[in-house]
């Protein structure tokens, strides 16, 4: 680390919608400041996972410290890269709390999108200095002036200092570096001398254990300090070393001081011991009050994960345990299902988080897994006054003891070209949405605000929105409140036996259509047997839909050549009795493909 000067430190973040060029601009900044040598440079350097590179998204926050000489002074520029997706909005808010400014990157052809809007509002709440960056000006469709007007009219940001650039060609990158130094203020001189550091992320390293990423607000942290976490009131730990991101995590001599960004290692064993947003202080001279804004991260979406081969259960357990080391938001609980065997009930921050975990299990651990349909947490008030919170259809109580049920709702902002307005309104109506307001973003695009049940969002809302807007629509959501809903348990019976893996909680108005589509799908995927198999959808033991898999026909009279008809009748009667007995005692084997196909039903 170079000479410490508080007034020469700039802490900033980058806010951008998916595919607007955030990681590419970060690459150009690293190149221009010579933080990374040319031979070590690669695309999306800060995105370390293959999954991040392929999808073009940032999943984990990646800080990096750069040094840049300007007007004879050397400035320390700390970039705290953040995930852009709404699922990780709490992590984004804590990363922004560690900064004094942010770069708002907007595609000069596509314009402002929903997820960048959501994060801009988080930055404005923190009173950060926001510098608009109009990227991809090399594209033929780029229209920087139109995008400037969008930013001014809809977000209310002054675009006098907006910078037009092209991360691809490198045009405008030096102007961005100068704007960071000129416009983003240095960290404030702390009034306190006690250590107060904000945790904005953590990472498990197999060699050194847990690395805690911090922005020091006041005081300093160094090797040998005894520290504790204020919000969680945990036990004390000894700091074994402090480091900086240059751009790789590198241990340094000395200390991390007020305004600086870095990490420390201590004898911490689990990521769960370290909560994002918590305040670090010393045991000897503790700070009086913690930093504000801390809250526990609770999962929002739940799904069951089961191995296709039951012998892979221990491997799956190990895989989830390893993923949890770097993902404190992932919750895991062992569960069993009559039809799927042993597996895990997992909690996620949202649908993208769930998809990432599934994909990493398959890729990194080479496992074949089945996932049950995602569900949300329902609040059930019983007639005896007790309240239950359930996320699994198997935990649904007897309907006769339920007073009422409440479901979580979310506030949704959708940005779309005008021509798709009626299609989106029909989609939201089908999803039980309530329209709050419609605003013009510019001459061609609208912002629609809706309240929607979370259950409708986690299933297929994103896919359907992309479909009806030909890929041009984008949305973000934030959790709202619980509202009374007519949610019931739909059971699927195969050969009169309920199959728990197909059970789901649905709105009463959609139960019959959902039940019918599941029954029709199962008729196609369950192989025929020597007896008829009824497939039924039922609510509270009342059948609302039914399909039948016809029996395989076997010609038992094939060996009878002519002769008396009574011989044939005896054989037919015997076959009839045998089929009746098979229907009573026969087990229907459900192939794994059936579970996967049912999950694909809209």
Swiss-Prot record:
GO annotation (BP), single: positive regulation of translation
Enzyme Commission numbers on file: 3.6.5.n1
UniProt KW keywords: Cell inner membrane, Cell membrane, GTP-binding, Hydrolase, Membrane, Nucleotide-binding, Protein biosynthesis
Gene Ontology molecular function: any one: translation elongation factor activity
Subcellular location as annotated: Cell inner membrane
Topology of this chain in the membrane: Peripheral membrane protein
Catalytic activity line of the entry: GTP + H2O = GDP + phosphate + H(+)
Residue ranges occupied by any tr-type G domain in the UniProt entry: 7-188
Coiled coil stretches, renumbered: none
Binding sites annotated in the UniProt record for GTP: 19-24, 135-138
One Pfam assignment: LepA_C
Family: Belongs to the TRAFAC class translation factor GTPase superfamily. Classic translation factor GTPase family. LepA subfamily.
Record's function text: Required for accurate and efficient protein synthesis under certain stress conditions. May act as a fidelity factor of the translation reaction, by catalyzing a one-codon backward translocation of tRNAs on improperly translocated ribosomes. Back-translocation proceeds from a post-translocation (POST) complex to a pre-translocation (PRE) complex, thus giving elongation factor G a second chance to translocate the tRNAs correctly. Binds to ribosomes in a GTP-dependent manner.
HAMAP family xrefs: LepA
Matches recorded under PANTHER family: TRANSLATION FACTOR GUF1 HOMOLOG, CHLOROPLASTIC (PTHR43512:SF4), TRANSLATION FACTOR GUF1-RELATED (PTHR43512)
Protein name (record): Elongation factor 4
Originating organism: Chlamydia caviae (strain ATCC VR-813 / DSM 19441 / 03DC25 / GPIC)
Lineage: Bacteria, Pseudomonadati, Chlamydiota, Chlamydiia, Chlamydiales
């Amino acid at each position: 680390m170079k000479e410490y000067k508080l007034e020469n430190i700039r802490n900033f973040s980058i806010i951008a919608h998916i595919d607007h060029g955030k990681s590419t601009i970060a690459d150009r900044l690293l190149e221009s400041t010579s933080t990374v040598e040319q031979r070590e440079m690669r695309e999306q350097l800060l995105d370390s996972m293959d999954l991040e590179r392929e999808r073009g998204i940032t999943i984990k926050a990646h800080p990096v410290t750069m040094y840049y000489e300007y007007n004879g002074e050397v400035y320390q520029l700390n970039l705290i890269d953040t995930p852009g997706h709404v699922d990780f909005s709490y992590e984004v808010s804590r990363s922004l709390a560690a900064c004094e400014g942010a770069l708002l990157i907007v595609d000069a052809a596509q314009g402002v999108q929903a997820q960048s809007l959501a994060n801009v509002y988080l930055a404005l709440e923190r009173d950060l200095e926001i510098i608009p960056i109009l990227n991809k000006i090399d594209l033929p469709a780029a229209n920087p002036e139109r995008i400037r007007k969008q930013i001014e009219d809809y977000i209310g940001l002054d675009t006098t200092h907006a910078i037009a650039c092209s991360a691809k060609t490198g045009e405008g990158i030096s102007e961005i570096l100068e704007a960071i130094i000129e416009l983003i203020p240095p960290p404030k001189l702390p009034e306190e001398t006690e250590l107060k550091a904000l945790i904005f992320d953590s990472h498990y390293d197999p060699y050194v254990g847990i690395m805690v990423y911090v922005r020091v607000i006041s005081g300093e942290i160094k090797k040998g300090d005894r520290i504790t976490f204020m919000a969680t009131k945990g036990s004390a730990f000894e700091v074994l070393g402090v480091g900086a991101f240059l751009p790789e995590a590198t241990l340094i001599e000395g200390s991390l001081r007020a305004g600086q960004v870095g990490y420390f290692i201590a004898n911490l064993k689990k990521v769960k011991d370290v909560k994002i947003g918590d305040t670090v202080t010393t045991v000897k001279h503790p700070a009086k009050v913690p930093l504000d804004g801390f809250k526990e991260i609770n999962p929002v979406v739940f799904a069951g994960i089961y191995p296709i081969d039951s012998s892979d259960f221990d491997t799956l357990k190990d895989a989830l345990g390893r993923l949890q080391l770097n993902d404190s938001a992932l919750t895991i609980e062992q569960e069993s299902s009559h039809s799927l065997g042993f597996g895990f009930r997992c909690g996620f921050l949202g649908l993208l988080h769930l998809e990432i975990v599934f994909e990493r299990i398959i890729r990194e651990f080479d496992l074949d897994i089945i996932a049950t349909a995602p569900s949300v947490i329902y609040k059930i008030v019983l007639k005896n006054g007790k309240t239950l919170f359930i996320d699994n259809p198997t935990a649904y109580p007897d309907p006769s003891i339920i007073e009422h049920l409440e479901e979580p709702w979310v506030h949704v902002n959708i940005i779309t070209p005008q021509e798709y307005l009626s299609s989106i309104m029909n989609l939201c109506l089908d999803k039980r949405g309530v329209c709050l307001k419609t605003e013009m973003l510019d001459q061609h695009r609208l912002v629609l605000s809706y309240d929607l049940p979370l259950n409708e969002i986690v299933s297929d809302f994103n896919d359907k929105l992309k479909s009806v807007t030909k890929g041009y629509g984008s949305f973000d959501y934030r959790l709202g409140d619980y509202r009374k809903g007519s949610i019931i348990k739909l059971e699927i019976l195969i050969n009169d036996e309920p199959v728990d893996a197909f059970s789901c909680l649905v709105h009463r108005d959609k139960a019959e259509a959902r039940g019918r589509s599941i029954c029709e799908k199962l008729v196609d995927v369950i192989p025929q047997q020597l007896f008829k198999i009824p497939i039924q959808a039922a609510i509270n033991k009342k059948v609302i839909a039914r399909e039948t898999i016809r029996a395989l026909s076997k010609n038992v009279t094939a060996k009878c050549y002519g002769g008396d008809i009574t011989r044939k009748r005896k054989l037919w009667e015997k076959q009839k009795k045998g089929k009746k007995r098979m229907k009573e005692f026969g087990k229907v084997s459900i192939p794994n493909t059936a579970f996967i196909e049912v999950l694909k039903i809209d």
